[in-house]
A protein has these predicted regions:
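Beta-strand-rich domains and repeat architectures in extracellular enzymes and scaffolds
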Residues: 14-51, 71-78
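A short beta-strand motif characteristic of beta-propeller blades
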Residues: 14-21, 60-70, 104-110, 149-154, ...
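Blade/loop signatures of beta-propeller domains
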Residues: 1-13, 138
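A flexible loop/linker signature enriched in serine peptidases of the S9 family
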Residues: 41-51, 67-73, 87-96, 110-115, ...
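Residue-level detector of Asp-centered blade-edge/turn motifs that repeat once per structural unit
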Residues: 33-34, 81-83, 122-123, 167-168, ...
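Short loop/turn segments that connect beta-strands within beta-propeller blades
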Residues: 54-57, 99-103, 143-147, 194-197, ...
């Protein structure tokens, strides 16, 4: 067999851009809080679609004409789920709710700016999300029924990311950071108390992070006693756990590349 020499990168390959683009790409994957529904976002040929599988039933597409695509440049996710249905960050800049089972999507917010990370409260009454407009990012709140306008919960930082509810619905954690840092260079983990009556945050405190320390992925334990997060200090990454009752803090795991 005669071999022909060609410059690097110019030989024929069975892996073409068309073949790569035609494949299915999985993005958001999550369960509903009661564990009865598996939800995922996939795209094929650049077209996003939402699928739901309930129990042993076959998966069904529930996109129904929406384009699930958050418009925040650094990401944040397009989907959130409650026991009742799916919250969708749509390319138009609106949040939608699609119930499990019959029913069309319902718009919850006006078409304004771009958003991501729809995060329903444990009781299903509220929805946290990230919002950006004309270079201004913030953490916002909307009622899950869409009957009143969204409100600003936190602002002032250049970027917001990964909001999380305490199981009681009385506290919220999130990460934020400022220019010129990237989130893996330096960011802050914030914790605040949420007052549902006034729809405001109080007792806001920085738990970890700085211009030199990166933090991320805040997660409350199911019983609400602990808050865990990732922290990157110098060459090592850590899983940090805070006891919210006693204030004790410990490093659960100290290793490398946890943030990778």
């Amino acid at each position: 067999m005669h071999k022909k020499k060609q410059p690097y990168g110019l030989w024929p390959s069975p892996i073409t851009p068309e073949r790569i683009g035609s494949g299915i790409r999985l993005e958001d994957v999550l369960f509903s809080p009661d564990g009865k529904n598996l939800i995922w976002l996939q795209s094929q040929g650049g077209v996003p679609a939402i699928y739901v599988q309930s129990g042993s039933n076959a998966p069904s597409e529930v996109t129904t004409g929406l384009k699930p695509r958050g418009g925040i440049s650094y990401g944040g996710g397009e989907l959130g789920a409650s026991k009742a249905g799916i919250y969708i960050a749509e390319a138009s800049g609106r949040l939608y709710f699609k119930p499990f089972g019959p029913g069309l999507p319902q718009a919850l917010t006006p078409e304004f700016g771009a958003l991501a990370s729809p995060t329903p409260s444990p009781d299903g009454n509220w929805l946290l999300f990230l919002h950006t407009y004309e270079g201004r990012d913030l953490l916002a709140l909307a009622p899950s029924d869409g009957k009143t306008w969204p409100r600003i919960l936190a602002q002032g930082a250049d970027f917001y990311y990964q909001p999380a509810w305490h199981p009681s619905g009385e506290k919220i954690a999130w990460m934020e950071w400022d220019h010129p840092n990237m989130p893996w260079d330096g960011s802050r983990l914030q914790l605040a108390r949420f007052d549902a009556a006034s729809q405001t945050l109080t007792e806001i405190q920085t738990l970890d992070g700085s211009k030199e320390i990166a933090v991320g992925q805040p997660l409350f334990s199911p019983d609400g006693r602990y808050l865990a997060w990732l922290a990157n200090r110098e060459e090592f990454d850590q899983i940090v756990v805070l006891d919210l009752q006693t204030g004790d803090r410990r490093i659960l795991l100290d290793g490398s590349s946890l943030l990778a």
